[in-house]
Each structure stands twice: as C-alpha cells, then as structure tokens.
C-alpha cells in the first residue's frame, strides 16, 4: 500500500477543468429542469391534472435521489472507515471464492483454512489492478492496518449511488411506457363509445325485449358449462386473457351496469364511459409512478438475493410474471361472475343484461389491492432491468451477477413478456373491471365540476364551523339563479317533487348528485360571464313569470317509424313552478 499513488486535490487541478465540469453539470441540470417545466405546462394546458400530479411525484422522486446522492457523498468517508472482522465480511458474496481469485489477480485459490483470512486482502488490490475506475476518495485503507475489512468501501458506495439512480430512472421510464402502450390499445374503445349514441344501438338494445340470459352476446361468452366449476372457470379465464382480453360485448355490458348502478336513468346516451375510465387511469398512474417506502423495502430485499448460490435468476424474474398472470385471470373471473349473478336472478332478462357491481368480487373486498399488485409487478420488472443495465455497465456482460448466458436470456425475455402482458392485457382489463366496485371514483366529474364541488364543500364546512346558515352559500351562489338547460342538472331530474317546502341545501344535494346531474357536460365556468350581466334582472322577473318551460331529455332522438320505439328510460317533464332553488 506504500506504493499507492494518491489522487490529486482541487489545489492541484487546473481551474479551467473545474469550470468546464461545473458548466456541463449546470447546463444538463437546467435543460432537464426546463423540460420538466414545459411538460407540466402542457399538462395544465390540456387539463390533465392527474398527469400533472404524477409529474410532480416524479419530481419529488428525483429530489429524493438528490438527497440520497448528497448523503452518500457526505457519508462515504465515514462509512468506509467502519471496520468489521474478516470472517463476517467473507459471507454472502455475489462471486464465488474461485471467481474472486481469478478476477482480482490471484492465480491459485487459497486453501480452505486460509480462505477467510486471505480473500478480503485480494479486494484491497482492486483499485491498483483494475484501471477502468478510480477510487472515489483519496487516501488508504485504514481498516487494513487493523487486520479488518471496511464495511463498504468508498468505491462500493459510489457504485451503489449509481445503481439507485438507475433504478429510479428505469422505474419511471418503465411506468410511462406501460401507460402509453395501454392507452394505445384502449383507443379502440372510442369507437364502441360512439356507437352507444347511434340509432342502430337503440334499436338493437330494445329495453322491452325479453331474452334468455344464455342467448345474449354476453351470456354466450360467459355462461357456459365451464363457468359452473371453479377449477374450469379459472382455467378458461387464464387462457382467455391472452386472446381478446376486453371484447366489445364486455365493454358495453359493464358500461350499462355502471350507469344503471351509479347514474341517473336516461344517462346511457350522454355519459362518456371511456373518458371516465381514462380519467380514473390517469389518477391511478400517480400511484404507480411513485416509489413508496414499502416498494423501497422490497428493493432492499431484492439486493440480498444476489448472493452466490441462491441462483436468483432462476426464480426472481418469474415473480412479476406469475403475479401479473394471476391478476389478469382474476379480472376475467370477475367479469364471468358478474354474468353468473345475472343468471342467478332468472333465466330471462329484459333489455340489456344488467350486471350489479360490488366490492365483494375483488380480493379482500378492495379493488385498490389489484392496483398495488400491478405497482409491485412494474417495480419488480423495472428492478430487474435496472440491475441488468447497471451490472453490465459496471462489470461487463459476464460478471458475478449473471455468469451464464441462460441468466441473461431469462432476465431479458421474461422482462419483455411481462411488459407486453402488463401493457396490452392487464392494464386495459384493470381499467375496465375496477369500475365494477361498489363505489364510483371522484373522477366521474370533469375537472371544472369537481373544482366547483370542492370549493362549495369547503365553504359549507367553514360556515358550519362558524355557526352560519348555508342558505346563502351554494355552488350556484355565483351562478345564474335559474340555470339553463345546457348548464344545469335540472333536465336529468325525474319525478321531481311538487312541494315547495324543501330547503335550498336539500334540493341542491339531490339535484347535484351523480345520479341526478349532468356531471360530464355541465360546465359552471362557461356560464359565469353570461350570469354576471343578467343575474339581477332575471331575479326580479323570476316571481312574475307565468309561462312554464318544459325540459326533456334530448340526447337520443329516434326518427318516426312503424311503431313507437322506447328508449331505456323515460324522463318526466318538469315545470319551473314545480322546481326552484329558492324556498
């Protein structure tokens, strides 16, 4: 160690070299910061609040990487000075003793009784024998003077620093690619959604038509002999996920069941189910892109699996593969069980088969648990990719972490297979089936309506806290007192009560609920400017109006033909005399 050449300090380094390094680092950092800012501005412009929040989580993750980098830089000197006995340091190595001896310059393998005493001394020669890296700190090994080994060397800390950064970057990129590919497959749903607004769809889905449940398109797909046995049900659903995992009949049937369970009668032709799914998926993407403490703990456990002799390449890559197959099968089973529940209520159905959503179809009664499993799969697969990239960069293609070609082939092939399954099979299936829970998600409202609701809710809670009455505070307090057909949820109300004794808050709560509101088309902001100029005049004339205006559902207009064709639900007419936001 006496012949070891110490590295230069900044006192011995040219100032122009230091300036060039600082300039390059600052330039790269500024470009990345501006790029992230531009992406965030584009998300705001396109009203992609969920994706903007996901971007904020990515920025928080990068900030966490900065803190880890700072701690590693500051603490590597202190950690490398922690000395442990050689017999403890000789356990759980990625390389075998013979491979370490060959790789680090020892021609013959030491005897078994001398192996523990000599093995760690070989590692002390790494920096002088391998020219591809320089030591991260200057000086010498203080632990060698004591006959011990450093807990983690300074150069080992530097390599760990690089791995954590690669892991975070690979995870974010992997999630973005998976989300983009999944949305690409879901584009075909737009055509199915538009079909529900056509006259042909109303003819083919006559609500007065009686059929056997097995004779419907949904019944022929799910109600068969194999669905009677749990074993055959899981076997068929396992293979079904690989071939047309989401079909048109499944989409339309689950869409109809969601609308009937959560929305107002007659909303079938107006509600855009595909946009609701898209908003929900964007909301879930915020969770997927984040690396929470549980996921970080799993990453630490994965690092322990690289010990020589565990052969982690034979089982670790298959964990995400098996989990994603089980999740895909479970989602298919849920769709089939929804169909079986229809048959349990009777062999004959009227109109479109009506599925009834419920949390009991999901594991532990929690639809969000499936999202956690998908998150775990994405991270595990990203971990495999990041570790392969990092180990190849640091030690070459053939190293102690993947010694054989079989290891490399398994890691790459399984990783690509999981990527395809998660993007094109499981993610679209998850986005559709998880809407079959007992509760609908807040994303059922568009961005502006959700903002108005939150603002009103905050104001109402504030008034209650101060003991005020909420009579003067409603979501319409800055809106027209009598909203028009296009800006109010009135036209979705059915069988409105004829009593005027209802309070302002009660009438609003019932009319503004998702079941009784035009949540997807009502835009309070678009009506605000008009309301400012006409609000006072309209209030003075409101009590003197004698004519009645009738509001009817106009979303589906069928042409006259031989015989009257009824839509799925009838909307009763409502008079302004019978409904009012005032007492």
Swiss-Prot record:
Stretches assigned to the Cytoplasmic side: 37-61, 183-284, 336-368, 433-583
A Gene Ontology BP annotation from the UniProt entry: defense response to fungus
The keyword Membrane is assigned to this record: yes
Record topology, Extracellular segments: 1-15, 83-161, 306-314, 390-411
Region called Disordered, residue ranges: 461-583
Bias (Low complexity) ranges: 470-484
Annotated region described as Calmodulin-binding, given as residue ranges: 447-468
The keyword Protease is annotated on this UniProt entry: no
This protein's UniProt keywords: Calmodulin-binding, Membrane, Pathogenesis-related protein, Plant defense, Transmembrane, Transmembrane helix
Transmembrane parts of this sequence: 16-36, 62-82, 162-182, 285-305, 315-335, 369-389, 412-432
Biased composition (Basic and acidic residues): 541-551
Function: May be involved in modulation of pathogen defense and leaf cell death. Activity seems to be regulated by Ca(2+)-dependent calmodulin binding and seems not to require heterotrimeric G proteins.
Family: Belongs to the MLO family.
Name of protein: MLO-like protein 6
Alphabetized GO MF terms: calmodulin binding
Entry-linked Pfam families: Mlo
Organism for this UniProt entry: Arabidopsis thaliana
Membrane association type: Multi-pass membrane protein
Subcellular location per the Swiss-Prot or TrEMBL entry: Membrane
Gene name of the record: MLO6
Cellular compartments per GO CC: plasma membrane
Domain description: The C-terminus contains a calmodulin-binding domain, which binds calmodulin in a calcium-dependent fashion.
Broad class of the protein's primary localization: membrane
